[in-house]
UniProtKB/Swiss-Prot annotation:
Annotated family: Belongs to the CarA family.
E.C. code: 6.3.5.5
Keywords: Amino-acid biosynthesis, Arginine biosynthesis, ATP-binding, Glutamine amidotransferase, Ligase, Nucleotide-binding, Pyrimidine biosynthesis
Name of the protein this chain belongs to: Carbamoyl phosphate synthase small chain
Gene name for this UniProt entry: carA
Quaternary assembly: Composed of two chains; the small (or glutamine) chain promotes the hydrolysis of glutamine to ammonia, which is used by the large (or ammonia) chain to synthesize carbamoyl phosphate. Tetramer of heterodimers (alpha,beta)4.
Domain Glutamine amidotransferase type-1: 172-359
Pathway(s) per entry: Amino-acid biosynthesis; L-arginine biosynthesis; carbamoyl phosphate from bicarbonate: step 1/1; Pyrimidine metabolism; UMP biosynthesis via de novo pathway; (S)-dihydroorotate from bicarbonate: step 1/3
Catalytic reactions of this protein: hydrogencarbonate + L-glutamine + 2 ATP + H2O = carbamoyl phosphate + L-glutamate + 2 ADP + phosphate + 2 H(+)
Region entry CPSase, spans: 1-168, 1-172
């Protein structure tokens, strides 16, 4: 089997077996701790520009099917696994992981010590990495890798170019696409919403002209400070319409209200992150995928209050506006992959829109 190298910007490297596409690629190397859900993870637009390391030792054992994609065209730069299953077993399986990666033009590497790599990332933080042929000159690879700047316009790359509708007979929702997962749209469709998905740079005036019952801010990749267009829109919407944000939408909501965000050392990426609701003490296990978080101290003096925290590191996981019907969460209530413990948040959004219909927009 052809050999491939994963070189990190700190000089560490791993040599293993090539899987997927043969092309060379550079991205931010991160790790995901989920035991299942590799297909949804690879197709999640929030992973734009990243090389995903799966910590579970066997990936691909139930294959890949056409129904569980979170986006049609995956935006990941590469995939790292300990072992890629060659003979998947599942009645829904259509192609192997290796075949899928080749079809989508995603290079990968298998047969390396993913535990060692994960511990390195936990210690040093996320690092730039390059996947290339094992025969490449290591010094040249390292020099090239260190000279490359990772892109900062991720949302622009994954957002819809123009608005489109997903019809329903119920509430009219505008879903702002910062890299939305298909599962979020499906959750709204399940509740019979008429959803209009709009590009990331849609203005408040354009949204209000659609006369929706509520607005959702989607997940997405990268640093929220790279999306300044969103902040003025959020300020123009909150207080006029019910607002619900997820992941990147949560961070943008915080920035729009005067708080700050920061980059986590190695991020939260997995399906088993415990989150506590402060009002009730309820603890749920959540699906998460983010490299940035809201700075708790920066919320002092703003109109926002913390509603949820992450129990592993006590980072902010939920916010609500003190005056308006607007709330956000850092985690993924739509799951896929992961537990559906917090799926009820979509129902709370529906209730919020009912309150708006009765003319009571303040919290």
């Amino acid at each position: 089997m052809t050999k491939r190298i994963l070189m990190l910007e700190d000089g560490n490297y791993f040599i293993g077996d090539a899987i997927g596409s043969e092309k060379e690629t550079i991205g931010e190397v991160v790790f995901n701790t989920g035991m299942t859900g590799y297909q949804e993870t690879i197709t999640d637009p929030s992973y734009y520009g990243q090389i995903i390391t799966f910590t579970y030792p066997l990936v691909g054992n139930y294959g890949v099917n056409r129904d569980d994609f979170e986006s049609i065209n995956p935006a990941v730069k590469g995939v790292v696994v300990r072992e890629a299953a060659e003979y998947p077993s599942n009645w829904r399986n259509q192609i192997t992981l290796n075949e899928f990666l080749k079809e989508k033009g995603i290079p990968g590497i298998a047969g390396i010590d993913t535990r060692k790599l994960t511990k390195l990332i936990r210690k040093e933080g996320t690092l730039k990495g390059i996947l290339s042929a094992a025969t490449a000159d290591k010094e040249e690879l390292l020099h090239h890798l260190r000279s490359v700047r990772l892109p900062v316009d991720q949302v622009h790359e994954v957002s819809s170019a123009k608005a489109f509708a997903s019809p329903g007979d119920g509430k009219r929702v505008v879903l702002v696409d910062y890299g939305v997962k298909s599962s979020i749209l499906r959750e709204l469709n399940k509740r019979n919403c008429y959803v209009t998905v709009v590009p990331y740079n849609t203005t408040a005036e354009e949204i209000l002209a659609m006369h929706p019952d509520g607005v959702m801010l989607s997940n997405g990749p990268g640093d929220p400070k790279d999306v300044p267009e969103a902040l003025e829109m959020i300020r123009g919407i909150q207080g006029k319409l019910p607002l619900f944000g997820i992941c990147l939408g949560h961070q943008l909501f915080a920035l729009a209200n005067g708080a700050d965000t920061f980059k986590l050392k190695f991020g939260h990426r997995g399906a088993n992150h415990p989150v506590k609701e402060l009002a009730t003490g309820r603890v749920d296990f959540t699906a998460q995928n983010h490299g940035y978080a809201v700075e708790k101290e920066s919320l002092i003096g703003t109109d926002l209050k913390v509603t949820h925290i992450e129990l592993n590191d006590e980072t902010v996981e939920g916010l609500a506006h003190k005056e308006y019907q607007a709330y956000t969460v850092q985690y993924h209530p739509e799951a896929n992959p992961g537990p559906s413990d917090v799926n009820y948040l979509f129902d709370e959004f529906m209730e919020m829109m009912n309150v708006k219909e009765e003319g009571e927009l303040h919290a």
